[in-house]
């Protein structure tokens, strides 16, 4: 029996709907259920072919469990190793290298020393910072936002250096980015599932939270724009290796700028995304999970330490060093 586990937190609608959908597909040899955990023994197999992770970003115990599960061949959506290492600033840089449009963005030193550090810990920092250069590169309006995290927490729109410093001085020890504010005519949030399926949703980030998904979901203003959004969304998720993600685009002068695309546990509650979007994402994730469960994939084989699990191996660098010592 191939088991698909769903690991979740405060969500009320998506997890049970996903389990019900998978089991309702009646695929021979496949069953979905909620993951139940106690103390986890090291190197113990999880018993799951696939785990859909909706909460480990908030619970370190769950993240450690998922890494242990991946070690034994469980396919975890999304990859807990990359998710742990990822951040939004790196994503912006990577996207730029991939040809995806990104507004000018700068990462900034912490406004206050992180806990356990002093000014002596910061001796590699320029002081004072060349703020004029930063503002000239980014421009105004701009958004000051954390280099990691989500949910629109600690995000501030600033229209001048004075507004910037007012908000920056309240960010404490958070690591922040400053990104040029796109004056968008259209805005879209896209579900990207299995690095293959894209569902474009008209979105209004300025509206109250429960009204942000535009009713009727009108399509992008042109076929060319729709094609570009789909292409860039897939490019980003394939490069990042995310099988369940949302990508947000702000469209200015016909150019879709990728604004936010590190959402490996994206909102999928029916009360916020609406019935049609909810039905689409439940169906797409269910089919992806079943396909992965039946695929025979072993993600552990792609990781750096996988070779060591197959038996004694020599690291190339160590091998070369040994030969050099012999010659000496």
Language model segments and positions:
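Generic enzyme active-site microenvironment
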Residues: 51, 77, 143, 246, ...
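Active-site nucleotide/adenylate-binding loops and adjacent lid/helix of ATP-dependent enzymes
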Residues: 2-8, 70-73, 81-187, 216-223, ...
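Phosphate-binding core of ATP-grasp and ATP-grasp-like enzymes
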Residues: 172-175, 181-215, 230-246, 250-257, ...
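Conserved N-proximal alpha/beta basic substrate-recognition cap immediately N-terminal to
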Residues: 9-121
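A short, glycine/Asx- and small/polar-enriched loop/turn
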Residues: 44-48, 253-258
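Glycine-rich phosphate/pyrophosphate-binding beta-alpha loops
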Residues: 56-57, 262-278
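A long amphipathic alpha-helix within ATP-dependent nucleotide-binding catalytic cores
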Residues: 209-257, 283-297, 301-319, 323-327
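Short, solvent-exposed loop/turn segments at secondary-structure junctions
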Residues: 11-12, 57-58, 83, 149-150, ...
């Amino acid at each position: 029996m191939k088991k698909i586990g769903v690991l979740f937190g405060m969500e009320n609608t998506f997890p049970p709907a996903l389990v019900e959908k998978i089991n309702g597909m009646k695929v021979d040899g496949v069953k979905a259920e909620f993951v139940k955990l106690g103390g986890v023994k090291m190197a113990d197999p999880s018993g799951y072919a696939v785990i859909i992770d909706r909460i480990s970003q908030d619970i370190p115990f769950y993240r450690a469990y998922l890494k242990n599960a991946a070690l034994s061949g469980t396919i975890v959506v999304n990859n807990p190793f990359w998710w742990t290492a990822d951040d939004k600033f790196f994503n912006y840089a990577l996207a730029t290298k991939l040809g995806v449009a990104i507004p000018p963005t700068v990462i900034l030193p912490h406004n206050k020393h992180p806990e356990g550090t002093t000014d002596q810990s910061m001796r590699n920092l320029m002081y004072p910072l060349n703020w004029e250069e930063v503002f000239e590169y980014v421009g105004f309006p701009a958004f000051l936002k954390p280099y990691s995290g989500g949910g629109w927490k600690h995000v501030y729109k600033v229209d001048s250096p004075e507004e910037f410093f007012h908000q920056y001085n309240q960010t404490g020890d958070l690591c922040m980015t400053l990104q040029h504010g796109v004056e968008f005519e259209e805005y879209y949030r896209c579900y990207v599932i299995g690095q293959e399926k894209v569902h474009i949703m008209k979105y209004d980030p300025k509206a109250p939270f429960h009204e942000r998904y535009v009713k009727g979901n009108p399509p992008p203003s042109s076929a060319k724009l729709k094609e570009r959004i789909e292409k860039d969304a897939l490019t980003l998720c394939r490069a990042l290796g995310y099988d369940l993600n949302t990508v947000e685009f702000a469209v200015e002068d016909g150019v879709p700028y990728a604004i936010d695309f590190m959402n490996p546990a994206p909102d999928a509650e029916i009360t916020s995304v609406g019935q049609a979007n909810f039905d689409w994402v439940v169906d797409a994730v269910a089919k992806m999970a079943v396909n992965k469960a039946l695929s025979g994939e072993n993600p552990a084989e792609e990781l750096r330490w996988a070779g060591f699990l197959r038996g004694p191996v020599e690291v190339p660098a160590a091998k070369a060093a040994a030969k050099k010592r012999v010659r000496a």
